[in-house]
Amino acid sequence: MGAFTEKQEALVNSSWEAFKGNIPQYSVVFYTSILEKAPAAKNLFSFLANGVDPTNPKLTAHAESLFGLVRDSAAQLRANGAVVADAALGSIHSQKGVNDSQFLVVKEALLKTLKEAVGDKWTDELSTALELAYDELAAAIKKAYA
């Protein structure tokens, strides 16, 4: 991977700001998208036991945390050229048995959600920046499995 640019980091940050503009709504978009593609993912998230509920603070907190991690991943890539995930993230994902196909479902849901959040500001360049940031975050989480 080439260097993550300042512009790419700014694009990721702008999508984060758009997401923060309506976290409950975009959390619903995100988790609904995940469950449409992988209904069994419901078992990985305790707060989805009763479906996607925008008033559930755990649902919105988890979405906000994940989207924030992608933003942080972009910042790490720009500053250091690599992403280091907290060992606890690796541990919980390992315990839950999260696999590559599930990381892909989350990535697709993240992109779909942020595309809706940014509206007509969506570009291929933004998509690429988000994909790089997410992919490097996912790789760092998987590396922390050990």
Swiss-Prot record:
Pfam families, sorted: Globin (PF00042)
Location, primary (coarse class): cytoplasm
InterPro entries for the chain: Globin, Globin-like_sf, Globin/Proto, Leghaemoglobin-like, Leghaemoglobin_Fe_BS
PTM section of the record: Nitrated mainly at Tyr-31 and, to a lower extent, at Tyr-26 and Tyr-134, in effective nodules and particularly in hypoxic conditions; this mechanism may play a protective role in the symbiosis by buffering toxic peroxynitrite NO(2)(-). Nitration level decrease during nodule senescence.
Modified residues (Phosphoserine): 46
GO CC annotations on file: cytosol; nucleus
Family the UniProt entry places it in: Belongs to the plant globin family.
Subunit composition and interactions: Monomer.
This protein's name: Leghemoglobin alpha
Lineage: Eukaryota, Viridiplantae, Streptophyta, Embryophyta, Tracheophyta
